[in-house]
């Protein structure tokens, strides 16, 4: 799996899991699957929407929200660059990612090669090792 929904909190936060979000302000980016998922995963949380990740991240840093949720691949960048926040280890969903290819002649073979390469990297745990090395996940 390439991505899953996770939580980013301030380093001194007492939030350790999605169960701790009741009554807390949780930031999401409008129109994302994270917004939709949070409504069912944490119905007692106060969901606060933002136009983009940078604004939501700033709100977390400024204490306007208690947690920020999105794909772990997005949130990991903030945690990697800023030790005043931390990414909680649990993933609450599996988020599919896609690769866009041009329609037409030759695309079928390219798609097969890409699919093979990704599956091979998953089978050999290359993706897991890269995530741990570079994203600290």
Where are these regions (language model features)?
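Short helix-initiation/N-cap motifs at beta->coil->alpha
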Residues: 12-14, 33, 48-58, 62, ...
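Soluble non-cytosolic domains of exported or imported proteins
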Residues: 28-32, 51-54, 62, 69, ...
């Amino acid at each position: 799996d390439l991505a899953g929904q996770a939580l980013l909190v301030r380093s001194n936060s007492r939030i350790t899991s999605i169960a701790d979000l009741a009554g807390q302000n949780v930031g999401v980016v409008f129109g994302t699957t994270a917004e939709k998922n949070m409504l069912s995963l944490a119905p007692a949380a106060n969901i606060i929407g933002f136009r983009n990740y940078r604004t939501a991240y700033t709100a977390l840093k400024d204490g306007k929200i208690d947690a920020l949720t999105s794909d772990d691949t997005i949130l990991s960048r903030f945690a990697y660059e800023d030790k005043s926040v931390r990414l909680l280890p649990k993933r609450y969903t599996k988020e599919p990612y896609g690769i866009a290819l041009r329609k037409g002649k030759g695309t079928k073979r390219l798609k097969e090669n890409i699919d093979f390469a990704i599956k091979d990297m998953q089978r050999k745990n290359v993706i897991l090792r890269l995530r741990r090395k570079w994203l600290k996940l």
